[in-house]
Amino acid sequence: MEITTLFTDGLFACMAAIGFGSINNTPRSLLPWCGLIAAIGHATRFAMMNSSFHINIILAGFAGSICIGIISSFASRHYRCPYEVLAFPALLPMIPGMYAYGTIQALVCYFQFNSSETPSEHYLNIFAYNAIMTMLIILFMVVGALVGIFASRIFKNFSRGE
C-alpha cells in the first residue's frame, strides 16, 4: 500500500466530512478539525483493509470509529463544543453506501423478477447479505464511537487520580 493512496483516501474523507459539517451548521472554525478527524478515521479503516492482514470492513470500520471517537472527545473538550459536532460529520464518510445501494437494488430486482421463471432466490440472498453487512458496519461504527467516548472519560478520570 502506497502512502499516496492512503493520503488520497483521507483527503476525500476530509472533503466529505467538511461538506456534511457545513450542512449541519458546524461552526466554520471547527470544519477543518471535522475534516482532519474524518481523514484520520477513514485512513485508519483504509489502511487496515488494504494491509497485508486484509481485515474486513466491519472490524476496520470499528477501529476507525474508535479513533474518531477518541479524537473527537478530546477535541470537543479543548474547543468547548458538543462531541456530536465533531464526531458525526467525521463518521458519515464511513457509512457503507455500496452495501446499502446493493440492498435496495437486490430488493427491486427481487420484486421485478419474482413473477417470471427466473430464480429469484438469488436476489433474496444478495439482499440479505447486503442488509446484514450494512447493519453490522453501522452498528460497529456507533459502538466504536461510544468506546472512544468512554475511553477518553476513563483517561480523564485516571489522569485526575479519581
Residue ranges of predicted features:
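Alpha-helical transmembrane segments and their membrane-interface boundaries
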Residues: 1-67, 71, 82-83, 105-162
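Ordered, amphipathic secondary-structure segments that act as subunit-interaction surfaces
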Residues: 72-90
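Hydrophobic alpha-helical membrane-insertion segments
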Residues: 85-104
